[in-house]
């Protein structure tokens, strides 16, 4: 009986003390216990009586509890364990005040903010505010370092991940969840089950999505996902789905890009589509230009900007009547129609981060001008800086309502038709080409962007992207249908140059 008595006495000794030094709010308190029960967990309670049920994980023969206090004050906890030596033991630790903003949450439909400060969050990965990393034990120290640095770790769960251990190790930290690196290789129902398991156990209610080969939009209807991810170098999928989904989105636009100029241009195109960037800069120069982007966007009301289509065919963002941002990828004359106010006008150089201010303000409803030179791309910034400052003084996160667009599906009103595939069947092995033929010719239709998706509805796996652009080669995933032949539903969505979204669909027989 003596060893049992010593164990209990030792446990009481530890729990009677401050198990962590005073810990700033939103920083980690890790409690290490000389226990061996892998089911050990603790219920933590803060000063405002919100509780967190935290499971332990095993390392070096001991049990570890990780808690991040969300407010200053005294936190108490009570252990539950199958080991009588630890069951019902209690302890406390102190949290001190800090300026940490909290964790990321959804706000204003397509944007993010911090949970504690309620200030906007500018998603900038992988060289800014976010770092993507596999949620593995081997990466434990790196994930802890990301948290300590005040950044967010976008955790990618391997398909064989031990989810309960991942929750215990990382669930208290500043993270987001991606339940798969590429969900398309997995069964949709299995992905949903993994996601629901995470959401049920995640005490901090972190954002959750999935990695993808193209778009995680097919998972949106399942209800668990709260932000969208893309892997879209040309940006057509996120630009079009931005008009459909009431969710924020991030795009890994830089896949395969090694050239600095191409990376910078793709970064700004992604931004103009209303999507946040989530790509690693391929060079040191590209990383510096990403920092230029962060500096510029941080000075805008980025949390209210939406794609704007009255910029003479240029890609643009706007909070109309307050701020307009136009990306001039190919230097030349630009015309922008704005609400009539007194605006400051400036040109931002995305290469070196310098700003050139126009001498005269814009007081009319139309800006017409040329960038300072034609050597490279430029960003035109038209804004009411004094008005923006006033908006910040009387802080209101959301100053306008964002409504989803209704797709025009009436064939008589759609300005294009599906010309390819012809016939009634598509071969999985050799799917052939796709093409949309314009039936109405205008500046708006000439600038149209297309997204082609396919779905075998009977199999319940939702849609997959099979092409982008007006024409090209269909790429049909081999696991799109569980058995062949199958009824294939092909859909094309087209976004014209003034922001109107159209859709057509057609059924085919999918054969081997």
Positions of predicted regions on the chain:
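Solvent-exposed loop segments of extracellular immunoglobulin-like
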Residues: 444-451
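Surface-exposed, flexible coil segments in extracellular/virion-facing regions
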Residues: 456-475
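Active-site neighborhood of glycoside hydrolase catalytic domains
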Residues: 162-247
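Short, solvent-exposed loop/turn segments at the edges of extracellular beta-sandwich modules
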Residues: 82-84, 494-500
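Aromatic- and carboxylate-lined catalytic core of secreted/periplasmic carbohydrate-active enzymes
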Residues: 17-21, 25, 30, 36, ...
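Extended acidic/polar, glycine-enriched regions
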Residues: 52-109
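An acidic-aromatic substrate-binding cleft motif
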Residues: 88-155
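Catalytic-core region of carbohydrate-active enzymes that cleave or remodel glycosidic bonds
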Residues: 145, 205, 222-285
């Amino acid at each position: 009986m003596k060893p049992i008595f010593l164990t209990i006495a030792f446990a009481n000794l530890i729990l009677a003390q401050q198990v962590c030094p005073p810990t700033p709010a939103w920083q980690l308190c890790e409690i290490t216990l000389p226990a061996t029960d892998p089911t050990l967990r603790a219920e933590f309670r803060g000063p405002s009586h919100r509780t967190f049920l935290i499971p332990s994980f095993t390392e070096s023969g001991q049990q570890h509890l990780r808690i991040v206090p969300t407010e200053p004050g005294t936190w108490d906890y009570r252990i539950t364990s199958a080991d009588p030596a630890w069951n019902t033991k209690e302890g406390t630790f102190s949290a001190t005040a800090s300026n940490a903003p909290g964790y990321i949450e959804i706000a204003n439909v397509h944007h993010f903010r911090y949970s504690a400060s309620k200030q906007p969050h500018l998603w900038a990965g992988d060289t800014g505010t976010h770092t993507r990393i596999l949620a593995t034990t081997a990466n434990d120290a790196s994930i802890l370092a990301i948290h300590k640095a005040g950044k967010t770790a976008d955790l990618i769960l391997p398909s064989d991940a031990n989810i309960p251990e991942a929750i215990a190790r990382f669930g208290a930290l500043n993270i987001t969840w991606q339940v798969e690196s590429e969900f398309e290789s997995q069964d949709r129902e299995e992905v949903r089950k993994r996601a629901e398991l995470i959401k049920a156990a995640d005490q901090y209610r972190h954002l959750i999505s999935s990695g993808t080969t193209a778009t995680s939009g097919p998972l949106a209807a399942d209800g668990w996902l709260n932000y969208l991810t893309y892997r879209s170098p040309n940006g057509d999928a996120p630009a079009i789905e931005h008009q459909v989904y009431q969710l924020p989105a991030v795009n890994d636009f830089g896949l395969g890009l090694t050239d600095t100029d191409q990376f910078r241009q793709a970064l700004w195109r992604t931004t103009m589509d209303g999507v946040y960037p989530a790509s690693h800069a391929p060079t040191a120069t590209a990383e510096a230009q990403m920092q230029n982007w962060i500096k510029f966007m941080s000075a805008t009301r980025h949390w209210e900007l939406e794609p704007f289509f009255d910029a003479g065919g240029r890609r643009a963002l706007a909070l109309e009547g307050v701020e307009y941002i136009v990306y001039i990828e190919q230097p030349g004359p630009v015309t922008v129609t704005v609400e009539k106010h007194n605006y400051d006008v400036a040109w931002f150089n995305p290469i070196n981060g310098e700003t050139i201010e126009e001498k005269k303000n814009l007081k009319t409803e139309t800006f017409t001008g040329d960038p300072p030179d034609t050597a490279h791309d430029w960003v035109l910034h038209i804004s009411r800086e004094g008005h923006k400052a006033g908006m910040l003084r009387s802080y209101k996160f959301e100053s306008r309502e964002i409504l989803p667009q209704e797709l025009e599906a009436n064939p008589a009103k759609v300005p294009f038709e599906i010309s390819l595939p012809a016939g009634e069947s598509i071969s999985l092995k050799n799917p052939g080409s796709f093409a949309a033929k314009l039936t109405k010719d205008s500046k708006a239709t000439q600038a149209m962007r297309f997204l082609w998706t396919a779905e075998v509805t009977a199999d319940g796996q939702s849609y997959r992207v099979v092409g982008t652009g007006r024409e090209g080669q269909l790429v049909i995933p081999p696991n799109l249908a569980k058995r062949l032949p199958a009824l294939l539903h092909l859909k094309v969505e087209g976004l014209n140059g003034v922001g109107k979204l159209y859709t057509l669909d057609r059924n085919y027989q999918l054969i081997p």
